[in-house]
Amino acid sequence: MRHRNTGRYLGRNSSHRDSMLKNMIISLIRYEIIHTTLQKAKELRKILEPLITISKINSISNRRNIYSKIRNNEIIHKLFNDIGPRFLKKNGGYLSILKSGYRKGDNAYMAYIKFTNTKKNI
């Protein structure tokens, strides 16, 4: 029985899944919008929104906490100096998922995931 087991497997083993989600976090912070499958976007939102909440307070301990999850100084700098301050007055709901139809090759449902107040368009 799988009672109280949360999260999606996404057709991968745990190390591959963690690595893929970490790379997607880095891409989303760098480009502020990415195109992926709907299930990956929902899983990414669940992981990234708490990191944005932590990044609203710029302290050494918060930087080290996020560095333990992301391991990329350029992305951490952008998260704390650009993205975190944008959401100071907002409590949650930092990301939006926009559905974009089915992928032609395998009919997977696709979506755009982006920051709610980004200036970049689809």
Swiss-Prot record:
GO terms for biological process: translation. Keywords: Ribonucleoprotein, Ribosomal protein. One of its GO terms (cellular component) is cytosolic large ribosomal subunit. The keyword Ribonucleoprotein applies. GO terms for molecular function: structural constituent of ribosome. InterPro entries: Ribosomal_bL17, Ribosomal_bL17_CS, Ribosomal_bL17_sf. It comes from the Bacteria. Gene3D superfamilies: Ribosomal protein L17 (3.90.1030.10). HAMAP family: Ribosomal_bL17 (MF_01368). Belongs to the bacterial ribosomal protein bL17 family. Part of the 50S ribosomal subunit. Contacts protein L32. This is Large ribosomal subunit protein bL17. The gene is rplQ.
